[in-house]
Amino acid sequence: MPSREIVEAFAKRLEDGDFVGAILDYYTPDAATYENLAEPVVGRDKLADKERGVLAAFKKVTAVRLGPSLIDGDVVASRWKFSFTHAEGATRTLEEVAWQTWRGNEIAEERFFYDPKQLGR
């Protein structure tokens, strides 16, 4: 079960823009993430590579947590607002809920729930 301090430190890394560092420091080596109902991406290194690709596709990416993270044993739920700015200057905003299963002080599984229409899909 993660402590409140660990969850807050993880959230701060995202809000500070250190998305790849947060993955490398807070996810288990065999972590899996799911985007809505898509097949998972498995493995911390693959997750970090995927995140690098997302960051390279945009001029700027920001994250703001909307309210506190809710912690119940090994489960943490957080509501996020991400903004993605393209090189041309257009910005798209995505609100999502991240549902995490922690193993000690590391994330073993994370599921992102959002409406893909927010991204023009």
Regions found by a protein language model. Give the residues of each.
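Short, cysteine-centered beta-strand-loop-beta hairpins and adjacent loop/turn segments enriched
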Residues: 56-60, 84-93
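A short hydrophobic beta-strand element
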Residues: 73-82
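Short beta-strand edge/turn micro-motifs at domain boundaries
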Residues: 95-121
